[in-house]
Each structure stands twice: as C-alpha cells, then as structure tokens.
Amino acid sequence: MNLKISFLKSKYILAIVSLTTFLSANETNHIETIYLGSGCFWGAEKGYESLNGVIDAESGYANGYGVKPNYRSIIQFKNKYNENNFAEVVKVTFNSNAISLEDILKHFFETHDPTQLNRQGNDIGTQYR
C-alpha cells in the first residue's frame, strides 16, 4: 500500500513538473532584453518596472573605461565631465507577448530628453549622456 501511494504521489508530481516546465519553456521564448540610458538610473528603473510585461529592470553601467564602474567612482567631481566615464543604464527584461519593444521605447522617449548632452534635468555629468 505504501508503495502504491508513493507511486501515485510521484506520478502527480511528475505531471505537475512537466506541465510547469512546458509552460516556462514556452514563455521564455518571448523574453527579450534591452539596455537603455535615460538619465539617473534609480528613477528610470522604477519607471520601467511599473510597465506591465516588464519582468525585471536592473540598474548598471555601460560604455566606459578607465573608471571603476561603481557609483562612488562615477559620481566623483573629477569624472563629472570625463568622456571615458560610464553611463548609467537600465537593463530591461520583458515578455514581448505582454509588452512590445515599441511601447518600451515610447516610455523611454516620454521620460527623458535625448537632446540634452550629459544631463537629464538637474542631473549633470557624463554618466547621464
């Protein structure tokens, strides 16, 4: 009797795992990533995370060298206008079945001014390019 119960439990667990694996594999076929620099990454990250279909938004740094890619190094006064400074960016991971790249880019252009060089509003420095 114990063996049969154990077998039935295993059978159901296997069925659930298989269904979950199938759904997860199907959903991940539509996972895409884009890196966007739209000024200070803290506010940008929060804005992207609020969009339905965005799975994750993660702050980071891109396109620099000669400066340590960490917050303290990047915001130092000596790096404020350093052309080699890293830019603050957000890595946006999204499900393209739930939100289009066009919608993400629409949000991108609505929330920052691409005509401002090395600044976004009151934030000034090459990290905001």
What are these regions, as identified by a protein language model?
Residues 10-21:
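Bacterial N-terminal signal peptides
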Residues 3-7, 24-129:
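Flexible coil/turn and secondary-structure edge motifs
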